[in-house]
Amino acid sequence: MAAKLISTGFRHTTLPENYVRPISDRPRLSEVSQLEDFPLIDLSSTDRSFLIQQIHQACARFGFFQVINHGVNKQIIDEMVSVAREFFSMSMEEKMKLYSDDPTKTTRLSTSFNVKKEEVNNWRDYLRLHCYPIHKYVNEWPSNPPSFKEIVSKYSREVREVGFKIEELISESLGLEKDYMKKVLGEQGQHMAVNYYPPCPEPELTYGLPAHTDPNALTILLQDTTVCGLQILIDGQWFAVNPHPDAFVINIGDQLQALSNGVYKSVWHRAVTNTENPRLSVASFLCPADCAVMSPAKPLWEAEDDETKPVYKDFTYAEYYKKFWSRNLDQEHCLENFLNN
């Protein structure tokens, strides 16, 4: 079982066979462009109407944007990164106490994405945590490093508030009431994936994570500021998203694409590797309550002309999440299964 993890400290000189992608499904890193006009939004702006306009343009055009002056203290962010690095540098024996291939487990260390279903693995280890309500899950979290529970608890609370603030702005940017998303999504769950991508001997042959969309409502990503690895697909072209100091990367998940009736996009994105440096990222996912019914917001289609109809049929988040995990990560957009005929 221990051989499944790649965060061992061992430096491979060639890529093991089970990570090598077919020629037609390789990242073609030389064809990736730099995204020069990637939105950077200052959440401390006092001009709310301008802020809402920026959010609308970013969500409709890119499905991604970065935010600065978001309210999370730099010390909390630095501590989160530090304790995550410390976790992955622990001994295999210590880490394997948390290892599981079962995606239903609320706290688990695993590798790739869904190893039970994959034919080719991804160059990634990750620690998956449920973070809300914290008191329900914190005792499952790693006891080592000793500061892990305290730091992650603090970070999770802060990031949750950032997410709520952004969801309000997104609601308003669609012309909806400020609290529309909050009401529809219900008591939102919160998950975290602490991703670790070791140096890879042949980055052009594999992925850290292949192209995928996020099944949740909103993702708040803390990127490693020293290594670029996130790429997004726009108009058929892959673009690298360079990390910005002290910024979070925000992306629209599948549920907000459905709620916006397709106005906002849950965009394909991927993580690539490099030969020199390990890369760390911390993704926080805000998720609708399992029983929350997802359907295109009526004000977005009822008042329009007769040809404007809901793009997606109604479904619960529990139904969607089950479908998402029953498939390979890089299959068709999971929302395709919920289109209105």
Curated annotation (Swiss-Prot):
Domain (Fe2OG dioxygenase) ranges: 188-288
InterPro entries given in the database record: DIOX_N, IPNS-like_FE2OG_OXY, IPNS-like_sf, Oxoglu/Fe-dep_dioxygenase_dom, Plant_2OG-oxidoreductases
Pfam families: 2OG-FeII_Oxy, DIOX_N
GO molecular function: flavone synthase activity; metal ion binding; salicylate 5-hydroxylase activity
Disruption phenotype: In the double mutant eds1-2 dmr6-1 and in dmr6-2, reduced susceptibility to the downy mildew pathogen Hyaloperonospora arabidopsidis. Reduced hyphal growth due to immature haustoria, often with aberrant shapes. Reduced susceptibility to Pseudomonas syringae pv. tomato DC3000 and the oomycete Phytophthora capsici, associated with enhanced defense gene expression and elevated salicylic acid levels. Normal susceptibility to P. syringae pv. tomato and Golovinomyces orontii. Enhanced expression of a subset of defense-associated genes.
Keyword NAD: yes
Name of the protein described by the UniProt record: Protein DOWNY MILDEW RESISTANCE 6
Entry keywords, A to Z: Dioxygenase, Iron, Metal-binding, NAD, Oxidoreductase, Plant defense
Induction line: Locally induced during infections with both compatible and incompatible Hyaloperonospora arabidopsidis isolates, specifically in cells containing haustoria or directly surrounding the intercellular hyphae. Induced by the salicylic acid analog BTH. Accumulates in constitutive defense mutants (e.g. sid2 and npr1 mutants). Accumulates upon infection with the downy mildew Hyaloperonospora arabidopsidis, the powdery mildew Erysiphe orontii, and the bacterium Pseudomonas syringae as well as salicylic acid (SA) treatment.
Family: Belongs to the iron/ascorbate-dependent oxidoreductase family.
Segments traversing the membrane: none
Record organism: Arabidopsis thaliana (Mouse-ear cress)
Cofactor comment: Binds 1 Fe(2+) ion per subunit.
SUPFAM superfamilies: Clavaminate synthase-like (SSF51197)
Residues reported in the UniProt entry to bind 2-oxoglutarate: R279
Enzyme class: oxidoreductase
UniProt-listed Enzyme Commission number(s): 1.14.11.-, 1.14.13.-
Binding site for Fe cation: H212, D214, H269
